[in-house]
Amino acid sequence: MTLRFTIMGCGSSGGVPRPALGWGACDPNNPKNRRRRTSLLVERRNAKGTTRVLVDTPPDLREQLLDAEVDGLDGVLFSHEHADHTHGIDDLRAIAIHRRALVNVYLDEGTASVVKARFGYCFETPPGSEYPPILREHRMTAGQAIDIAGAGGSITALPFAQEHGDILSLGFRFGALAYSCDLKGLPPDSVAALGGIDVWIVDALRHAPHPSHFSVAEALEWIGRIKPRRAILTNLHSDLDYEALRATLPASVEPAFDGMRIEA
């Protein structure tokens, strides 16, 4: 089974450029330096249609869905509750209206409690409102695979735990590719879950150390441990110019850019 992956956004929490703060070290003339907040689209296609799974709903989701010409989603996976990964959740409303069906979303216990406190109206009509809910909630747990059905066939996602400052985030393995957008470390079970992957899309926030994200050097160290055939760095801050960063990386490692597509 070959899946197609689209980097919907590869920027850090403020994106690139940032309001009032600009482009940082990034060349504004290179389109690959314009970065929306991180998200990943996974697609499986056959003669009957396409199955689509989205990872995270960043604040830029509306533009991301328009650019990728997404008119339906069979499932949405949430890596964790931080604003840059959840605050575009209301943009799923258009998908629900178009499909005339609730959008299936998958969250772990901690993420669900925070997201439902912030966006409860997406899951249940609040008192005094006439607006129907737009989401159907499903619980997920690290280490337990999820099968999401659709017209193009089933997509299997294996969530795995990641250390992300004072919380745990989730990474996801889809067949030969794994996605680790926000992390500072991996527990042993998650290292085992990454065994034998071909492609790893992995957090590399900046050159300087950070308390809850891999630096570029830490990402490269972990890539050396996991040993994917190919690695793609994401969640890139404004001090990481695309061409300057790429020139420093090993041949099997490259920076992500918005709209990048991978098959695995």
Question: How would you label these PLM feature ranges?
Answer:
Residues N33, P58, L183, P209-V216:
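A conditional alpha-helix N-cap/helix-loop micro-motif detector
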Residues P159-F160, S180-D182, V202, L233-T234:
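Thr-Gly-centered strand-to-loop micro-motif
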Residues G143, P187-A264:
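Binuclear metal-ion centers of metallo-dependent hydrolases, dominated by the metallo-beta-lactamase
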Residues D60, H82, K184, L205, ...:
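Catalytic metal-binding/acid-base residues of hydrolase active sites
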Residues M1-S180, D189, R246-A264:
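Binuclear metal-dependent hydrolase catalytic cores
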